[in-house]
């Protein structure tokens, strides 16, 4: 009977000892976590410091009372600390990326904080980088378009100026050519006017301008209608010396007023431009021709005396 009682007492003492050890270990673990918790709060920086834990209420017998809701408070503090760390990391990452944007860096920042930044925040930063790159590309395209337009406008103005200068130069050359032609015609007219002198009763009388022009016209018409004229007869008809008549005919030939040839027998043969072209065509077609062949062909190509000569000018 005594043995079972001792067994019960020993079992009760063993259970009490186990409970005592369990409580002692729990208090030691709580005391060891409190310094570590204080160090973590100090490293968080900008994290708001949680309120102090309630002091332990003394228990009877001098033993401290267990803190109320200690585990819940510790978990809340850890969550707040992690949130603060994440915000600090994101702010630091964004500051780095903004600094790189100002320096012209197009790629997203890859720092030691990239592993801690959230995927959503990283996506926003990448979209911001893409928008910035698109704006820069559009601005570069606008600048290039402005440059090309300015270059085309400058080339167009240069071409317009070149055409204007060419037109002015062409007009100036045409004006000079007209003036030179008019000057030559006037000089030739004066030469002819001085050459045609009517000798009457041994006294030379110079014609007026109107008379000289009329006499020249009649002189040319007489040659054209006669076709073949003897130079001595022509000189006597117009009242000039034979040499002066020859000189006047040569001047008219040089001017292109009349066309023809002066043969070695002292005759002038007037040939129209059409007849001259027909003779030239005959020579080109036949190749080499003799004088006899040319003379024979001329009888059919040139109208010899078909027009009755007009009355010689008085």
Curated annotation (Swiss-Prot):
Mutagenesis / variant outcome for changing residue 176 to R: Impairs some post-translational modification without affecting interaction with UFL1
Annotated segments matching region Disordered: 31-75, 100-186
GO molecular function: ubiquitin-like protein ligase binding; UFM1-modified protein reader activity
Membrane topology: Single-pass membrane protein
Chief localisation class: endoplasmic reticulum
Motif UFM1-interacting motif (UFIM), residue numbers: 195-209
Regions of compositional bias (Basic and acidic residues) in chain numbering: 124-186
Annotated segments matching region Mediates interaction with CDK5RAP3: 1-114
Keywords: Dwarfism, Endoplasmic reticulum, Isopeptide bond, Membrane, Phosphoprotein, Transmembrane, Transmembrane helix, Ubl conjugation, Ubl conjugation pathway
Superkingdom field: Eukaryota
GO CC, alphabetical: cytoplasm; endoplasmic reticulum; endoplasmic reticulum membrane; nucleolus
Free-text description of this protein's post-translational modifications in UniProt: Ubiquitinated. Ubiquitination probably triggers proteasomal degradation and is negatively regulated by UFL1, the enzyme involved in the ufmylation of DDRGK1. Ufmylated; conjugated to ubiquitin-like protein UFM1, probably at Lys-267 by UFL1. The relevance of ufmylation is however unclear: as DDRGK1 acts as a substrate adapters for ufmylation, it is uncertain whether ufmylation is a collateral effect of ufmylation process or is required to regulate its activity.
Compartments it resides in: Endoplasmic reticulum membrane
Region described as Mediates interaction with TRIP4: 118-216
SMART domains: DDRGK
Pfam families in alphabetical order: DDRGK
Family statement: Belongs to the DDRGK1 family.
Pathological condition linked to this protein in its record: Spondyloepimetaphyseal dysplasia, Shohat type: An autosomal recessive skeletal dysplasia that affects cartilage development. It is characterized by vertebral, epiphyseal, and metaphyseal abnormalities, including scoliosis with vertebral compression fractures, flattened vertebral bodies, and hypomineralization of long bones. Affected individuals may exhibit a small trunk, short neck, small limbs, joint laxity, bowlegs, and/or abdominal distension with hepatosplenomegaly.
Comment on protein domains: The UFM1-interacting motif (UFIM) specifically recognizes and binds ufmylated RPL26/uL24, resulting in stable association between the 60S ribosome and the UREL complex.
Record-given protein name: DDRGK domain-containing protein 1
Organism: Homo sapiens (Human)
Gene: DDRGK1
């Amino acid at each position: 009977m005594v043995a079972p009682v001792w067994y019960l007492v020993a079992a009760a003492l063993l259970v009490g000892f186990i409970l005592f050890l369990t409580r002692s270990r729990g208090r030691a673990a709580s005391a060891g976590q409190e310094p570590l918790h204080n160090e973590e709060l100090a490293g968080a920086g900008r994290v708001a410091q949680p309120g102090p834990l309630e002091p332990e209420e003394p228990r009877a017998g001098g033993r401290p009372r267990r803190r109320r809701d200690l585990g819940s408070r510790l978990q809340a503090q850890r969550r707040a600390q992690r949130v603060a760390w994440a915000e600090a990391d994101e702010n630091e990452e964004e500051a780095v990326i903004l600094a790189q944007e100002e320096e012209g860096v197009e790629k997203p920042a890859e720092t030691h904080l990239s592993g801690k930044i959230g995927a959503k925040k990283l996506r926003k930063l990448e979209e911001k980088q893409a928008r910035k790159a698109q704006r820069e590309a559009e601005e570069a395209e606008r600048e290039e378009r402005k440059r090309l337009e300015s270059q085309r406008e400058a080339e167009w103005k240069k071409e317009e100026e070149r055409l204007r200068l060419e037109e002015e130069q062409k007009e100036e050359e045409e004006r000079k050519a007209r003036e030179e032609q008019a000057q030559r015609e006037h000089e030739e007219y004066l030469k002819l006017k001085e050459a045609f002198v009517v000798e009457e009763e041994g006294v030379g009388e110079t014609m007026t301008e109107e008379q000289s022009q009329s006499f020249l016209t009649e002189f040319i018409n007489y040659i054209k209608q006669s076709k073949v004229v003897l130079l001595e007869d022509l000189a006597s008809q117009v009242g000039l010396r034979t040499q002066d008549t020859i000189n006047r005919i040569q001047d008219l030939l040089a001017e292109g007023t009349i066309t023809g040839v002066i043969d070695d027998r002292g005759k002038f043969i007037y040939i129209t431009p059409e007849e001259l072209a027909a003779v030239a065509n005959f020579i080109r077609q036949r190749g080499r021709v003799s004088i006899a062949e040319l003379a024979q062909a001329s009888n059919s190509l040139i109208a010899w005396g078909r027009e009755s000569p007009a009355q010689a000018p008085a």
